[in-house]
């Protein structure tokens, strides 16, 4: 961890191509490796925040759809199923390393509104303080 010796907080963004094979199935091996590495970094004393997309991709595979939906209702349906699956997998895998996780959802308007941004920052600080993982979609 010599490269990260002065780092106190690390934000890692993973996308659909990291989490899902081209055939739409979840890349479990890659997820395990990612979570193993992030858990080790967290254990070294660096606070880790995982920012993850991939809900539509995971949902597409879980629903057995032949391809990623192109219409908004289809993407929302796949995302709904995929988000549950993704959080279940993150929770299960992080718990193997003794880490609890949480999910923090926000939108562009939450960041743009001063009051909502303040609430978001307070929530994020509290989540970080309690060593929970934050997850953004």
What are the functions of these language-model segments?
Residues 1-49:
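N-terminal glycine-/serine-/threonine-rich phosphate-binding loop
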Residues 61-83:
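A charged helix-plus-loop insertion that forms the helical arch/lid used to bind
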């Amino acid at each position: 961890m010599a490269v990260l010796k002065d780092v106190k907080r690390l934000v890692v963004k993973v996308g659909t191509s990291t989490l899902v094979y081209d055939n739409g199935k979840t890349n479990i091996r890659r997820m395990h490796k990612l979570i193993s590495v992030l858990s080790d970094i967290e254990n070294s004393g660096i606070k880790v925040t995982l920012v993850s997309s991939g809900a539509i991709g995971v949902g597409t595979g879980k629903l057995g759809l032949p391809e990623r939906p192109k219409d908004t209702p289809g993407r929302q349906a796949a995302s709904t199923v995929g988000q549950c699956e993704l959080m279940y997998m993150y929770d299960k895998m992080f718990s193997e390393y003794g880490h609890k996780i949480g999910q923090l959802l926000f939108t562009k308007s939450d960041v743009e509104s001063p009051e909502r941004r303040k609430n978001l920052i307070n929530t994020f600080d509290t989540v970080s303080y309690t060593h929970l993982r934050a997850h953004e979609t």
